[in-house]
Swiss-Prot record:
InterPro entries tied to this protein: ICAM_N (IPR013768), ICAM_VCAM (IPR047012), ICAM_VCAM_N (IPR003987), Ig-like_dom_sf (IPR036179), Ig-like_fold (IPR013783)
Protein's organism: Mus musculus (Mouse)
Protein encoded by which gene: Icam4
Claim: Signal is one of the keywords in the record: yes
Entry keywords, A to Z: Cell adhesion, Cell membrane, Disulfide bond, Glycoprotein, Immunoglobulin domain, Membrane, Repeat, Secreted, Signal, Transmembrane, Transmembrane helix
GO CC annotations, alphabetized: cytoplasm; extracellular region; extracellular space; plasma membrane
Pfam families: ICAM_N (PF03921)
An example molecular function term from Gene Ontology annotations: integrin binding
UniProt keyword Ribosomal protein present: no
UniProt protein name: Intercellular adhesion molecule 4
Residues making up the signal peptide according to the UniProt record: 1-22
Cytoplasmic-facing ranges: 253-262
Length: 262
């Protein structure tokens, strides 16, 4: 009962993908193709695939053409094996290194050509995010956060939080390297009484066009012991006096990493 009721509205959505009220269009103008010939469609699955840098992926291009078709995959990625069945072809894509690669599958059925697209993204979640205990030098604390083995570094944002609130963040978009990287963030701050016993944490976030990957460090504390009487006398809000990002990039590690993967 229910599925019989649902079917017409689903068909309508497919026939009128955009705009207007499908109900009204149904009343005014029923779909042109006869009920027996479904509209020709092409799908490429999955639409978004994530792989480690240098990894490979399989994409399945399927269609509903009852006739023998010509189908091809258009991409800048290197193609590997192909497996096919009736109504589908599965393509292997090799050595995905770009953080974002577009793939199109083009199928021609009885003179009509349609295509479907998919995206493959290569990324590597940081192996570790480590915030060192603050080091007191004079009246200032030096915080160091290490983010190791991350890719693509150009889409990384590293932030420091105190008591859950962001006190500093830096985007590394100026770095366009195509290798795994280590990032060290150094932050120097003054601390006052308010900062005592507040957990400090370091956060790494990759934002890959909708795919967000987050990692964070274990918390560290500013303790009474580290706080000198002189710094209590200083402003109770922290002031950044020097900030730096250090980036180490290792092509060697991409290879090592891949060796571990396979
Ligand atoms: C490809 O997709 C078709 C249709 O969804 C499915 O029947 C087939 O098993 C899939 N092939 C592979 C290799 O996943
Ligand atoms: C798979 O592809 C081959 C070569 O193009 C073709 O001869 C064969 O009919 C295809 N198999 C199926 C089940 O479509
Ligand atoms: C990155 O950090 C890891 C772990 O701390 C270290 O073993 C490796 O040598 C570093 N790689 C580079 C390129 O600095």
């Amino acid at each position: 009962m229910e599925s019989a009721l649902l079917l017409p509205s689903l068909l309508l959505v497919a026939a009128y993908p955009r705009g207007g009220s499908p109900q009204q269009e149904w009343m005014q103008s029923p779909p042109a193709p006869s009920v027996t010939s479904a509209p020709f469609w092409v799908r490429l699955n999955p639409e978004l695939e994530a792989v480690p840098p240098g990894g490979s992926a399989w994409l399945n291009c399927s269609h509903n053409c009852p006739l023998p078709v010509h189908s091809s995959l258009r991409t800048q990625l290197r193609q590997g094996k192909i497996v096919n069945g009736s109504g589908w072809v599965s393509y292997q894509l090799l050595d995905v290194r770009a953080w974002n690669s577009k793939v199109r599958c083009v199928v021609t059925c009885a003179g009509e050509t349609r295509e479907a697209t998919a995206r493959i993204t290569a990324y590597k979640r940081p192996r570790s995010v480590i915030l060192e205990p603050p080091v007191l030098v004079g009246h200032k604390y030096t915080l160091r956060c290490y983010v190791t083995h991350v890719f693509p570094v150009g889409f990384l944002v590293v932030s420091l939080r105190r008591g859950g609130r962001v006190i500093y963040h830096e985007s590394l978009e100026r770095f366009t390297g195509s290798d795994l990287a280590n990032v060290t963030l150094t932050y120097v701050m003054r601390a006052g009484l308010n900062d005592l016993w507040q957990p400090l944490t370091c956060h790494a976030r990759l934002n890959l066009d909708g795919l967000v990957v987050r990692s964070s460090s274990a918390p560290v504390m500013l303790t009474v012991l580290a706080l000198s009487p002189a710094s209590i006398a200083l402003a109770s809000t922290s002031i950044a006096t020097l900030v730096g990002i250090l980036l180490a990039v290792g092509a060697v590690y991409v290879r090592k990493y891949l060796a571990v993967q396979t």
